[in-house]
């Protein structure tokens, strides 16, 4: 693939898919090339690519989050009897233990870990509906193609095409915001 040509074309169209499909079609030749973009829209391809990136990113974040939680849990246990001054309104308060303080840091991170399966369920869905979201170009094979594509990409099938319904990706973004806020 000519990445430089793809970069120029992407700047012109705003979508890398157009240039990619053009090159893949040329590489596939006239017989196979006509099927390169069959059934899917540019939006389907872009959204599915984003979902694949989100999936990989969430896996990396989960690994780091689990390691952080493990470290904090160990620290909380190790310092469960280490007394320190509590703080309230930027002033000394009643004594607490450092282990308690660390457990307070740990608690919202564990809540984020608990929420992650639901975030994945909502965000990691295949986008595949075709031009109008009806899979019409695939005839009576639309649902079967969707099922196989979702299986191949290890993504959930969407109940309905989500070209304009961004809630799943929004939930993943909100989850990240909550995690970072903690």
Task: Explain the meaning of each model-derived region.
Residues 168-182:
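A conserved active-site cap/scaffold subdomain adjacent to cofactor or substrate pockets
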Residues 1-135, 141-148, 157:
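A helix-coil-helix interface module used to build multimeric assemblies
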Residues 144-169:
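TM-loop-TM module centered on a large, flexible mid-protein loop between adjacent transmembrane helices
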